[in-house]
């Protein structure tokens, strides 16, 4: 199963992946209209640690502690990824606390959890953060 991998040595900390993620999840076709004058709410985030920058995203663990800990059954592992059904999420945010990678975060509206869902339902089949990373620090590939 393909996953997103980040090479922190190549990450410039430009945050373009965050904008592309927010745009992809806006379901609009014009980035300016989708994001102009709005706070962005990406499902990936860039952490800046001085000279080191890296993108934090869901690893889609096969034995995910977030799935096991979800009291409402909103999180599940299906088709090789951890999926979230926000209509089932009760907003306890236990998944936020137990994710060892810090990849699940509270959604700004509704008090439910949000995370990367591998937005591959586009023409290229690659997540937007990968397609638009100007330094190729984010890749979408299969590894052992």
Language model region names:
Residues 1-144:
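Non-ligating segments of multi-cofactor redox enzymes
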């Amino acid at each position: 199963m393909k996953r997103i991998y980040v090479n922190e040595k190549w990450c410039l900390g430009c945050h373009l992946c965050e904008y592309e993620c927010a745009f992809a999840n806006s379901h609009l076709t014009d980035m300016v209209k989708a994001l102009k004058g709005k706070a962005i709410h990406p499902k990936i985030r860039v952490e800046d640690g001085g000279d080191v920058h890296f993108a934090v995203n869901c690893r889609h663990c096969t034995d995910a502690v977030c799935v096991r800990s979800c009291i409402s059954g909103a999180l599940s592992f299906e088709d090789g990824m951890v999926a979230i059904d926000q209509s089932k999420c009760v907003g306890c945010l236990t998944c936020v606390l137990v994710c060892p990678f810090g990849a699940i975060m509270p959604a700004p509206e509704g008090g439910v959890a949000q995370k990367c869902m591998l937005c591959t339902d586009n023409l290229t089949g690659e997540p937007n953060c990968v397609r638009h990373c100007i330094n190729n620090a984010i890749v979408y590939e299969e590894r052992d």
